[in-house]
Amino acid sequence: MAIEIKVPDIGADEVEITEILVKVGDKVEAEQSLITVEGDKASMEVPSPQAGIVKEIKVSVGDKTQTGALIMIFDSADGAADAAPAQAEEKKEAAPAAAPAAAAAKDVNVPDIGSDEVEVTEILVKVGDKVEAEQSLITVEGDKASMEVPAPFAGTVKEIKVNVGDKVSTGSLIMVFEVAGEAGAAAPAAKQEAAPAAAPAPAAGVKEVNVPDIGGDEVEVTEVMVKVGDKVAAEQSLITVEGDKASMEVPAPFAGVVKELKVNVGDKVKTGSLIMIFEVEGAAPAAAPAKQEAAAPAPAAKAEAPAAAPAAKAEGKSEFAENDAYVHATPLIRRLAREFGVNLAKVKGTGRKGRILREDVQAYVKEAIKRAEAAPAATGGGIPGMLPWPKVDFSKFGEIEEVELGRIQKISGANLSRNWVMIPHVTHFDKTDITELEAFRKQQNEEAAKRKLDVKITPVVFIMKAVAAALEQMPRFNSSLSEDGQRLTLKKYINIGVAVDTPNGLVVPVFKDVNKKGIIELSRELMTISKKARDGKLTAGEMQGGCFTISSIGGLGTTHFAPIVNAPEVAILGVSKSAMEPVWNGKEFVPRLMLPISLSFDHRVIDGADGARFITIINNTLSDIRRLVM
């Protein structure tokens, strides 16, 4: 019998299929992953709702899909069904020997993540899901890092005790699992028979844990993530270290119990430094049963794997060629790559099926830093005459305090540095007469208040409309330059970003189709989005797709400033504080409200004459807003 397999409830948005994990003819178990999909904010694997044989695959990599879409057709495998009664009979006969296991509820708590509270940013499972040990359950984010919280044991999700946006800390209850109880009578019997043969306890040995290859520089220990007595799994993070340009977690090279900690927060370490001593189990006793002997090579192979991994990574360090295939990485790794400004297409993945791991991104960043430092000395490249950043001990001159930069400041700082260095900026300054505009705006606000429209019209919406009109007349300003500097992408839509000052730093929400919206509609949208920005609730989609940016700091003062172009855009408008000034009208000086504006643009795309024409269009439109209806 044919069974249709459809996408379960994944929300309203369409997602892209990035990987198909089965092929026609495969026998599939219930809950086995079928496809991987990725949206704007996360990627996930879609599991099979039941067992069967893949008869048809209705989708391909790159297709868009959504909740309820048909992805595959399964054959229920009648042959297997015929054999089922016989198997059932055998199971029934065997049943008295082992009573069914009783299910028990177990709490799942946040492991030791330090003393600070963190925010739940994503819940990766739902009630009813069968979860394996070490499978990721939630994603949490603090001031300095984000991480996925794994399941400490296998089970079925019975209750979820947290929501996205909740604050949690070490020990917080996040879920309740239903887990299988003790096995029946047969299991103890088997254990008792095996016990005499393997009575001698395995001998414990002591092994040193050293810092792996992190480059030649010393780094500072910023966090110790385990304590004496902790049982640690291989690859579990032990400490966090931070250098001048990056931070990383140092993983355990093997499993064991922490016997001694050799470092403290604030200590300096480097490649090869001793950080801990582990107590590890020795070889299994010689009298172990034959079954155990047959399985013994597996741990040995697993122990060898970490040793082979650095070699693979070392080979990959020089292989940063562009990867045209789809990049396989979890949302956590993608976020890490965004924070470091890493193009994942250039990173070679060493995980299963080429998946990019945290270590791959860290290796790429480390190699990129080494190349950047070596390039000026080796080739005379870099910025001519650029000196290294001065190292000054400020504490010699008086009392100091060091304050960590916010997450937004760190990200935007790197972007601004790149934009300023890579884009040849030219800035035109002008003043526009907004006397009539301001009179009209105040009149409209009074009318809106009388009619209880619950809207406040600001000068920014008129500037947005004036910019949209200029972009329609001069489409070269509504473009982006290709990475190789050889082509322009001309956009047929007009989306304008407006910089908003928030307690956490500057953010730039994007307003879509400004040329198609009226003043009232834009005013309402500006009020709503600005509030979301200040509350820190903007989504990624609300900050993407911009064509041109407006940075208005007139409310804070200043007469002129030169804004930095927001790549990959090619121009930005700065708006300063308006003031009454005497203006000559041909007969006499009259008081007029003048607004200083400044247009910065990429000189590779726009020449000075076009820059002057563009700012003049804005000037003329704001001076006589009747032009907006022409």
Swiss-Prot record:
<feature type="modified residue" description="N6-lipoyllysine">
    <location>
        <position position="144"/>
    </location>
</feature>
<dbReference type="InterPro" id="IPR050743">
    <property type="entry name" value="2-oxoacid_DH_E2_comp"/>
</dbReference>
<dbReference type="Pfam" id="PF00198">
    <property type="entry name" value="2-oxoacid_dh"/>
</dbReference>
<feature type="domain" description="Lipoyl-binding 3">
    <location>
        <begin position="206"/>
        <end position="279"/>
    </location>
</feature>
<dbReference type="GO" id="GO:0045254">
    <property type="term" value="C:pyruvate dehydrogenase complex"/>
</dbReference>
<dbReference type="Pfam" id="PF02817">
    <property type="entry name" value="E3_binding"/>
</dbReference>
<comment type="similarity">
    <text>Belongs to the 2-oxoacid dehydrogenase family.</text>
</comment>
<dbReference type="Pfam" id="PF00364">
    <property type="entry name" value="Biotin_lipoyl"/>
</dbReference>
<feature type="modified residue" description="N6-acetyllysine">
    <location>
        <position position="396"/>
    </location>
</feature>
<dbReference type="InterPro" id="IPR001078">
    <property type="entry name" value="2-oxoacid_DH_actylTfrase"/>
</dbReference>
<comment type="subunit">
    <text>Forms a 24-polypeptide structural core with octahedral symmetry.</text>
</comment>
<feature type="domain" description="Peripheral subunit-binding (PSBD)">
    <location>
        <begin position="328"/>
        <end position="365"/>
    </location>
</feature>
<keyword id="KW-0808">Transferase</keyword>
<dbReference type="InterPro" id="IPR023213">
    <property type="entry name" value="CAT-like_dom_sf"/>
</dbReference>
<keyword id="KW-0677">Repeat</keyword>
<dbReference type="GO" id="GO:0004742">
    <property type="term" value="F:dihydrolipoyllysine-residue acetyltransferase activity"/>
</dbReference>
<dbReference type="InterPro" id="IPR011053">
    <property type="entry name" value="Single_hybrid_motif"/>
</dbReference>
<feature type="active site">
    <location>
        <position position="547"/>
    </location>
</feature>
<feature type="region of interest" description="Hydrophobic">
    <location>
        <begin position="373"/>
        <end position="389"/>
    </location>
</feature>
<dbReference type="GO" id="GO:0005737">
    <property type="term" value="C:cytoplasm"/>
</dbReference>
<keyword id="KW-0450">Lipoyl</keyword>
<feature type="active site">
    <location>
        <position position="607"/>
    </location>
</feature>
<dbReference type="GO" id="GO:0016407">
    <property type="term" value="F:acetyltransferase activity"/>
</dbReference>
<keyword id="KW-0007">Acetylation</keyword>
<dbReference type="InterPro" id="IPR000089">
    <property type="entry name" value="Biotin_lipoyl"/>
</dbReference>
<feature type="active site">
    <location>
        <position position="603"/>
    </location>
</feature>
<comment type="function">
    <text>The pyruvate dehydrogenase complex catalyzes the overall conversion of pyruvate to acetyl-CoA and CO(2). It contains multiple copies of three enzymatic components: pyruvate dehydrogenase (E1), dihydrolipoamide acetyltransferase (E2) and lipoamide dehydrogenase (E3).</text>
</comment>
<dbReference type="GO" id="GO:0006090">
    <property type="term" value="P:pyruvate metabolic process"/>
</dbReference>
<dbReference type="GO" id="GO:0042867">
    <property type="term" value="P:pyruvate catabolic process"/>
</dbReference>
<dbReference type="InterPro" id="IPR003016">
    <property type="entry name" value="2-oxoA_DH_lipoyl-BS"/>
</dbReference>
<keyword id="KW-0012">Acyltransferase</keyword>
<dbReference type="InterPro" id="IPR006256">
    <property type="entry name" value="AcTrfase_Pyrv_DH_cplx"/>
</dbReference>
<feature type="modified residue" description="N6-lipoyllysine">
    <location>
        <position position="245"/>
    </location>
</feature>
<dbReference type="GO" id="GO:0031405">
    <property type="term" value="F:lipoic acid binding"/>
</dbReference>
<dbReference type="InterPro" id="IPR036625">
    <property type="entry name" value="E3-bd_dom_sf"/>
</dbReference>
<feature type="region of interest" description="Hydrophobic">
    <location>
        <begin position="542"/>
        <end position="567"/>
    </location>
</feature>
<protein>
    <recommendedName>
        <fullName>Dihydrolipoyllysine-residue acetyltransferase component of pyruvate dehydrogenase complex</fullName>
        <ecNumber>2.3.1.12</ecNumber>
    </recommendedName>
</protein>
<dbReference type="GO" id="GO:0006086">
    <property type="term" value="P:pyruvate decarboxylation to acetyl-CoA"/>
</dbReference>
<feature type="domain" description="Lipoyl-binding 2">
    <location>
        <begin position="105"/>
        <end position="178"/>
    </location>
</feature>
<feature type="domain" description="Lipoyl-binding 1">
    <location>
        <begin position="2"/>
        <end position="75"/>
    </location>
</feature>
<dbReference type="InterPro" id="IPR004167">
    <property type="entry name" value="PSBD"/>
</dbReference>
<feature type="modified residue" description="N6-lipoyllysine">
    <location>
        <position position="41"/>
    </location>
</feature>
